[in-house]
């Protein structure tokens, strides 16, 4: 806030804990460097050179400065959400030095139509985060970011409904949980959020994707339970809105008994 440039170090490669910590949805205040040390079972090894922090375990370290007035255009290019990103101005890193260890490996992954190599990261994140999510989002039972949709654009969630149990069952507390999910951390990047009531079907799981959709579609009142958030902030890579980082989101909430019977077979004329 007080300087016209700041120093940046990019770490590439190193132990798996480095790459995994970089993509982990960590709570506010817990740095990726600290989490990498927790995963590795020892502190993050680093040293200082010319005012830059260098990882002692990385395959490559790229150092440079980012100037606040040094914007240059980037794009257009394709991205993992399926859109073709337009050209925009972004900050520029002016590289000073590139360091590497002996016989370094440049790490990368293949992305595209799921499942791809990065799908394994998503699966592992779910395993680690699932027990912690109810503590971060009170009332939540579980949440699942769907890999086939690009992970964060589509969330399936199950939450408890404890408001006014003596009234006719309508989505109430689960809407509070839905707004919490869309207002915090990486779950705020979701474009579509489907949320169901745990008490309606205690055996329901977000990981049984066909079963989850059957549960929601057989209960949802489409005249009442499509909750749009318009003119809000959305993912930078989402070009479905009317501006950059601007668009809409949709919450689909289902609570109560079955109100329609779903078809289980395709008609012969289809």
Question: What are these model-derived regions, one by one?
Answer:
Residues 1-3, 9-11:
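Internal mixed beta-strand/loop scaffold within catalytic domains of large alpha/beta enzymes
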Residues 6, 14-270:
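Charged, compositionally biased interaction regions
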């Amino acid at each position: 806030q007080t300087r016209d440039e700041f120093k940046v170090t990019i770490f590439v490669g190193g132990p798996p804990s480095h790459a995994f910590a970089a993509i982990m949805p960590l709570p506010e205040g817990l740095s990726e460097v600290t989490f990498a040390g927790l995963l590795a079972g020892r502190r993050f090894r680093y040293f200082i050179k010319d005012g830059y922090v260098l990882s002692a375990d990385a395959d490559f370290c790229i150092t440079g400065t980012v100037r606040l007035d040094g914007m240059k255009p980037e794009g257009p290019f394709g991205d993992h959400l399926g859109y073709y990103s337009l050209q925009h101005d972004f900050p520029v890193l002016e590289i000073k030095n590139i360091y590497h260890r002996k016989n370094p490996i440049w790490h990368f992954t293949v992305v595209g139509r799921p499942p791809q190599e990065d799908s394994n990261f998503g699966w592992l994140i779910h395993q680690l985060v699932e027990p912690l999510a109810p503590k971060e989002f009170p009332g939540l039972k579980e949440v699942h970011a769907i890999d086939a949709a690009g992970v964060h654009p589509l969330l399936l969630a199950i939450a408890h409904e404890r408001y006014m149990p003596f009234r006719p069952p309508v989505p109430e507390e689960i809407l509070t949980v839905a707004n919490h999910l869309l207002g915090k951390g990486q779950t705020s990047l979701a474009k579509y959020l489907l949320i169901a009531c745990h008490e309606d079907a205690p055996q329901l799981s977000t990981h049984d994707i066909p079963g989850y959709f059957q549960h929601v579609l057989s209960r949802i009142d489409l005249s009442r339970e499509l909750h749009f958030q318009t003119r809000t902030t959305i993912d930078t890579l989402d070009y479905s809105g009317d501006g950059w980082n601007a668009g809409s989101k949709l919450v689909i909430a289902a609570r109560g008994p079955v109100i329609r019977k779903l078809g289980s077979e395709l008609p012969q004329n289809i």
